[in-house]
C-alpha cells in the first residue's frame, strides 16, 4: 500500500500506513476440474434455475391448453353420437371439430418448438458450466463477465444494449432477456397505477406463488379496492363493495386483520387525516407494490435481489476496504476513491490485514525486503528501485512527485516494515 506523509515530517521517522492501498493476492487456480465445477455451481444457481422454471411453466401451460381442447372436442363428438341431427348439421359440426383439431395440432407444434428452444437453453447452460477447465479458464471467465454485465443491463432496463452485447458475444442462450422484458411490462404498468398486468402474471404463476405463500395478489386486490374508494362517489362505493365480495372475501381466512383494516376505508375519504387510514391512500403504495413484485419475481426464479455485478464487486471490495480508502486524500488507484464504489463498500467490514503490503506511488511495485521503502525528508515514502532510477536520471537528485520537494539521494532514510 502507499504511504502518506508521516505526522511529524522528520526524516528519521518510520512512516504511517494512512495512505494504504491493498494489493490483492493473486488467485490460485485449482487444477482439480471437479472442484472448479462444484464451486461454480454454488455461484451459478440462477443461471440454471431461471430457464428451468420457465421451461416447466411452458410445459404446464401447453398441457392445460391441450387438455382443455381435447375435452371440448371429445364432448362435441359425444353430443353428435347421441343426437338426431340432420346429415347437414352433423357434417357441419364435424367440420368444426376437425378445424379445432387442426388448430390444436398447430398449437401443439408451436408449443413443442417453444419447449425445444427452452430445453436447448437449459442444455446450453449446463454445457457452459461443464466446460470449466484450467486450459480455458480465461475464456470462460470472460464469458461469465459478459453474462454479469448483461444481467446488470437488464435490471437497469437497457434491453437494446444487453441484446447487442449478447448477440455479439454469442451468449443469447446464457442470458434471460425475455424474462426481464416480461417483468418490465408489469413494473411499468404498476408505475402507471394499473394492476391488470400484475394480476395476469399472478394467474400465470399461481401454483408457484401459492406454494411460496405469497400474498402479492392479495396486495394487488387491496390496492384495486382502495382505488375504487378513492373515487368517492356512491357508484364507486357500490363497486368497491361488489369487488370486495368477489375478490377479497376468499382471503379472509388467512389475512383477516389486513382485510378489515382496508375495508374500514369505506367509512373514510381519501382526504382523511386519520394516520391509520391516510397511509392506505398515499400514492407511494404503488411503489411498495413495485418493490414487492421485484421480490416475488426474484424469489420465483431464484434470482438475487442485487445485480450480480454489485455482488461480485462487493466480494472484491471486501478485500480492499481500509480506513484510508474512505478519506479525502485517498489515491486515485484505490477503487474506494470512486463514490460509486464507496457506496457499494459502505455495508462491508474493513479488510483484516495481518501483514502490511506497501505499494510504491511511483512504480506501483510492491515494497519488500528486495525493494525496501525509503523515507524522504518530508515524510513521504517510495520504493528504493524507483528512487534510484530517478536519482540516476537527475544527477543524484530526488523530486517528490506529490509535494515537489527536491533533495539528494543521500538524504533518504531506509524504513522498516513491522
From Swiss-Prot:
Taking the first listed entry, what is the main subcellular location of this protein, grouped into a coarse class?
cytoplasm
Q: State the UniProt keywords alphabetically.
A: Cytoplasm, Metal-binding, Zinc, Zinc-finger
Which InterPro entries does the UniProt entry name for this protein? CRA_dom, CTLH/CRA, CTLH_C, Fyv10_fam, LisH, ZF_RING_GID, Znf-RING_euk, Znf_RING/FYVE/PHD
* GO-annotated biological processes: proteasome-mediated ubiquitin-dependent protein catabolic process
- The segments annotated as RING-Gid-type zinc fingers are 330-403
* CDD domains per record: RING-Ubox_Emp (cd16659)
One short Pfam name that applies is zf-RING_UBOX
> Per UniProt, what is one GO molecular function of this protein?
ubiquitin protein ligase activity
Q: Where is the CTLH domain?
A: 179-236
Q: Which GO terms describe its cellular component?
A: cytoplasm
Q: According to the lineage, what is the superkingdom?
A: Eukaryota
Question: What subcellular compartments does it reside in?
Answer: Cytoplasm
Keyword Electron transport applies:
no
The residues covered by the LisH domain are 141-173
> Subunit structure, per the record?
Interacts with RANBPM.
Tell me what this protein is called.
Answer: Protein MAEA homolog
Tell me what organism the protein belongs to. Answer: Arabidopsis thaliana
Amino acid at each position: 500500500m502507499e504511504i502518506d506523509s508521516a505526522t511529524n515530517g522528520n526524516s528519521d521517522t518510520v512512516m504511517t500506513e494512512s495512505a494504504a492501498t491493498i494489493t490483492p493476492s493473486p488467485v490460485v487456480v485449482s487444477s482439480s476440474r471437479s472442484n472448479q465445477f462444484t464451486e461454480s455451481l454454488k455461484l451459478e444457481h440462477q443461471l440454471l434455475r431461471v430457464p428451468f422454471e420457465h421451461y416447466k411453466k411452458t410445459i404446464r401451460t401447453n398441457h392445460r391448453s391441450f387438455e382443455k381442447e381435447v375435452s371440448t372436442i371429445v364432448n362435441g363428438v359425444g353430443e353428435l353420437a347421441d343426437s338426431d341431427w340432420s346429415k347437414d348439421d352433423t357434417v357441419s359440426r364435424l367440420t368444426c371439430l376437425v378445424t379445432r383439431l387442426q388448430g390444436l395440432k398447430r398449437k401443439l407444434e408451436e408449443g413443442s418448438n417453444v419447449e425445444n428452444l427452452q430445453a436447448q437453453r437449459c442444455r446450453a447452460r449446463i454445457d457452459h458450466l461443464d466446460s470449466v477447465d484450467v486450459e480455458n479458464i480465461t475464456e470462460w471467465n470472460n464469458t461469465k463477465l459478459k453474462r454479469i454485465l448483461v444481467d446488470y443491463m437488464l435490471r437497469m432496463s437497457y434491453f437494446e444494449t444487453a441484446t447487442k452485447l449478447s448477440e455479439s458475444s454469442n451468449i443469447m442462450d446464457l442470458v434471460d432477456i425475455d424474462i426481464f422484458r416480461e417483468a418490465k411490462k408489469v413494473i411499468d404498468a404498476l408505475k402507471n397505477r394499473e394492476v391488470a398486468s400484475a394480476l395476469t402474471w399472478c394467474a400465470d404463476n399461481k401454483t408457484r406463488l401459492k406454494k411460496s405463500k405469497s400474498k402479492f395478489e392479495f396486495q394487488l386486490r387491496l390496492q384495486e379496492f382502495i382505488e375504487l374508494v378513492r373515487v368517492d362517489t356512491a357508484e364507486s362505493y357500490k363497486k368497491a363493495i361488489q369487488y370486495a365480495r368477489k375478490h377479497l372475501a376468499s382471503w379472509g381466512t388467512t389475512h383477516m386483520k389486513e382485510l378489515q383494516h382496508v375495508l374500514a376505508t369505506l367509512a373514510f375519504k381519501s382526504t382523511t387525516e386519520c394516520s391509520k387510514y391516510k397511509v392506505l391512500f398515499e400514492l407511494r403504495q404503488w411503489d411498495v407494490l413495485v418493490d414487492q413484485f421485484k421480490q416475488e419475481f426474484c424469489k420465483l426464479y431464484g434470482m438475487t435481489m442485487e445485480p450480480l455485478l454489485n455482488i461480485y464487486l462487493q466480494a472484491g471490495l471486501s478485500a480492499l476496504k481500509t480506513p484510508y480508502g474512505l478519506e479525502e486524500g485517498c489515491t486515485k488507484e484505490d477503487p474506494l476513491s470512486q463514490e460509486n464504489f464507496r457506496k457499494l463498500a459502505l455495508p462491508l467490514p474493513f479488510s483484516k490485514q495481518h501483514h502490511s503490503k506497501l505499494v510504491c506511488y511511483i512504480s506501483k511495485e510492491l515494497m519488500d525486503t528486495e525493494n525496501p521503502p525509503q523515507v524522504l525528508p518530508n515524510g513521504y515514502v517510495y520504493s528504493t528501485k524507483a528512487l534510484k532510477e530517478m536519482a540516476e536520471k537527475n544527477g543524484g537528485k530526488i523530486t517528490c512527485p506529490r509535494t515537489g520537494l527536491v533533495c539528494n539521494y543521500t538524504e533518504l532514510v531506509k524504513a522498516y516494515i513491522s
